[in-house]
UniProtKB/Swiss-Prot annotation:
Protein name as catalogued: Mothers against decapentaplegic homolog 7
High-level lineage: Eukaryota, Metazoa, Chordata, Craniata, Vertebrata
Organism from which the protein derives: Mus musculus (Mouse)
Phenotype for S249A: No effect on stability, nuclear localization or inhibitory function in TGFB signaling. Abolishes transcriptional activity
PANTHER family: MOTHERS AGAINST DECAPENTAPLEGIC HOMOLOG 7 (PTHR13703:SF44), SMAD (PTHR13703)
Residues noted as binding Zn(2+) in the record, renumbered to the chain: C125, C180, C192, H197
Listed Basic residues bias regions: 67-76
Post-translational modification: Phosphorylation on Ser-249 does not affect its stability, nuclear localization or inhibitory function in TGFB signaling; however it affects its ability to regulate transcription. Phosphorylated by PDPK1. Ubiquitinated by WWP1. Polyubiquitinated by RNF111, which is enhanced by AXIN1 and promotes proteasomal degradation. In response to TGF-beta, ubiquitinated by SMURF1; which promotes its degradation. Ubiquitinated by ARK2C, promoting proteasomal degradation, leading to enhance the BMP-Smad signaling.
Family matches, as Gene3D superfamilies: 2.60.200.10, SMAD MH1 domain
Purpose: Antagonist of signaling by TGF-beta (transforming growth factor) type 1 receptor superfamily members; has been shown to inhibit TGF-beta (Transforming growth factor) and activin signaling by associating with their receptors thus preventing SMAD2 access. Functions as an adapter to recruit SMURF2 to the TGF-beta receptor complex. Also acts by recruiting the PPP1R15A-PP1 complex to TGFBR1, which promotes its dephosphorylation. Positively regulates PDPK1 kinase activity by stimulating its dissociation from the 14-3-3 protein YWHAQ which acts as a negative regulator.
Record localization: Nucleus; Cytoplasm
Region (Disordered): 14-42, 67-87
Length: 426
């Protein structure tokens, strides 16, 4: 019997599904710590981002993540549940095949392209009926039935569960990317089911003191940089020089300049590499190596840093991050295969005198900056805010390696590869 192309595409898609219980590569789970955590052990090593993360919590510098109800990477999985797990796998396979076989050949090809590229290539939306729910269970084929979590899934949720996050349970755990046609639409007739047009939401958690909080100690600017402007707690000075003798701090505060909403600086340890990148479009990709990449390519910058650690981390940046300005603030989506670490004043408690470092796993999104919260942080009688009005408008992002009291790196200036994002407060 001749096998049709559609059947071959369905089998190929199923083989490309996300691993359910196998160990991920070291970088996905432990790239942030990598043997550099103080008192490291099971806390960081078992938190995997590509397939897990459970409730999607963004941990502090410890990188703690809550595993989902499915119990991925449990050190001692209960043997009594082996049969149930096998039955669930068979049910999921039957349901997935029944859904995929209803798709047209062109739709299957589009889905396969998105899955195999792992989001590295911009792929089109896969528009399918939005009111179809998929019932997961014995003798329950895909049909339009009332949602009964966790046994009933919408089509986008099912495909995300199969191809990205096996522990995914509810639509509230994911966020649609702004590049998607279904972004911002409520109950559309056709909804995009491309699993790489959605991201997993990070849920902030309160860290157990005293492990994740550290004082905001300022370092002095270097003597050779008279124009240095302290823009962050750790670097102590970022020497921004703009054409015409104006510092970038003055440029950011020019009332008539509204062409950009933020600028990005790339650092390798204590050295800034390349020029500032002004962002005008609502979305920006920051990457080292990205197929069909369009944005801020770190791989094209000339770096004289010969450190093996810097070169190793640089090679792991890969697809990097996506920075998007949306209605409720600025979001960061981790497109790479390794965790990123973020510090932002608007992610922390407004009453706190210290800031947290949040670990964001691959495939996860976090609202890294909130304009309303940032404005509320400005205190007119505070000398620091008077001298540096954009201090609360700065976000720091480190690739692969974390920093803070939990790590040997106390300051972000010790991280191999990191970004400083300064938002235009006007």
């Amino acid at each position: 019997m001749f096998r049709t192309k559609r059947s071959a595409l369905v089998r190929r898609l199923w083989r490309s599904r996300a691993p359910g219980g196998e160990d991920e590569e070291e970088g996905v789970g432990g790239g942030g710590g990598g043997g550099e955590l103080r008192g490291e052990g099971a806390t960081d090593g078992r938190a995997y981002g590509a397939g897990g993360g459970g409730a999607g919590r963004a941990g502090c510098c410890l990188g703690k993540a809550v595993r989902g109800a499915k119990g991925h990477h449990h050190p001692h999985p209960p043997t009594s549940g082996a049969g149930a797990a096998g039955g669930a796998e068979a049910d999921l396979k039957a349901l997935t095949h029944s859904v995929l076989k209803k798709l047209k050949e062109r739709q299957l090809e589009l889905l396969l392209q998105a899955v195999e590229s792992r989001g590295g290539t911009r792929t089109a939306c896969l528009l399918l009926p939005g009111r179809l729910d998929c019932r997961l269970g014995p003798g329950a084929p895909a049909s339009a039935q009332p949602a009964q979590p966790p046994s009933s899934y919408s089509l986008p949720l099912l495909l995300c569960k199969v191809f990205r996050w096996p522990d995914l349970r509810h639509s509230s755990e994911v966020k649609r990317l702004c590049c998607c046609e279904s972004y911002g639409k409520i109950n559309p007739e056709l909804v995009c089911c491309n699993p790489h047009h959605l991201s997993r939401l990070c849920e902030l958690e309160s860290p157990p003191p005293p492990y994740s909080r550290y004082p905001m100690d300022f370092l002095k600017p270097t003597a050779g940089c008279p124009d240095a402007v302290p823009s962050s707690a750790e670097t102590g000075g970022t020497n921004y020089l703009a054409p015409g003798g104006l510092s970038d701090s003055q440029l950011l505060l020019e009332p008539g300049d509204r062409s950009h909403w933020c600028v990005v600086a790339y650092w390798e340890e204590k050295t800034r590499v390349g020029r500032l990148y002004c962002v005008q479009e609502p979305s920006l990709d920051i990457f080292y190596d990205l197929p069909q990449g369009n944005g801020f390519c770190l791989g094209q910058l000339n770096s004289d840093n010969k450190s093996q650690l810097v070169q190793k981390v640089r090679s792991k940046i890969g697809c990097g991050i996506q920075l998007t300005r949306e209605v409720d603030g600025v979001w960061v989506y981790n497109r790479s295969s390794y965790p990123i670490f973020i510090k932002s004043a608007t992610l922390d408690n407004p009453d706190s005198r210290t800031l947290l470092v949040h670990k964001v796993f691959p495939g996860f999104s976090i609202k890294a900056f909130d304009y309303e919260k940032a404005y509320s942080l400005q205190r007119p009688n505070d000398h620091e805010f008077m001298q540096q009005p954009w201090t609360g408008f700065t976000v720091q992002i480190s690739f692969v390696k974390g920093w803070g009291q939990c790590y040997t790196r106390q300051f972000i200036s010790s991280c191999p590869c990191w970004l400083e994002v300064i938002f235009n407060s006007r």
